[in-house]
């Protein structure tokens, strides 16, 4: 895997840091912001989805450098990075201004188009709990929330038979009962909770729903193990948020 930094890896790291959560004044956030502010990382008005250095190391097929893929997929990446910049006390005025321009343009597109690439709706969803931190626009917070939830309803995969492959499950958009999309996806959320319980192997964790299609087989096995761990933590957190995991009762542990 590419040991060099990339905007996509940076976004993934910041998403994990936010979930933990880590101190936004700490070295991870500040280092990420410094990296994103480098002229060498820029792509058009934001950052690229793929970088040329990826091709020198084992990588997923969709992460090979591809200018056309950058045009199609950088929207969601840029919106996600802009949210991290604007909601985690970034002190760099130029970087904040860049992030605000990205978000303002994204809000205009939110109401005028349907296709936002693979990550677009997911990253719009990330804003639902932080609408008060959006830059000023012509749209109210209620209008923005309604439009995002509508897009989520259109994007979510409703067929449980399709959840075994890489599709946007309900848990991509709803992580707790307080999430904005939960009332409209409640039945689907309950179905996925059942699905996770029913499909968890007895002596393992869930398999990831994607592959590298035979590319870099040895490196893929390493990446597969990492991703299985990450997705297992996500799934357990999802189950816990909806009270689907019974707590261990103290005094009943088996020490044999």
In which residue ranges do the predicted regions lie?
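Ser/Thr/Asn(+Pro)-rich, low-complexity disordered segments
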Residues: 1-8, 12, 131-154, 244-246, ...
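Phosphate-rich cofactor/ligand-interacting catalytic cores and adjacent structured alpha/beta frameworks
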Residues: 59-62, 71, 76, 83, ...
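Well-ordered alpha-helical scaffold segments within catalytic/enzyme domains
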Residues: 11-24, 80-91, 123-137, 171-185, ...
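Accessory, usually C-terminal, subdomains that scaffold auxiliary metal cofactors
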Residues: 147-150, 154, 168-229
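Solvent-exposed loop and edge beta-strand segments that line ligand/cofactor-binding
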Residues: 1-11, 62-76, 108-121, 157-165, ...
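Long, well-ordered core segments of solenoidal/helical folds
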Residues: 1, 27-47, 92-115, 143-161, ...
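Long, positively charged, glycine-interspersed low-complexity recognition regions
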Residues: 213-256
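Extended ligand-binding groove/face enriched in aromatic
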Residues: 1-100
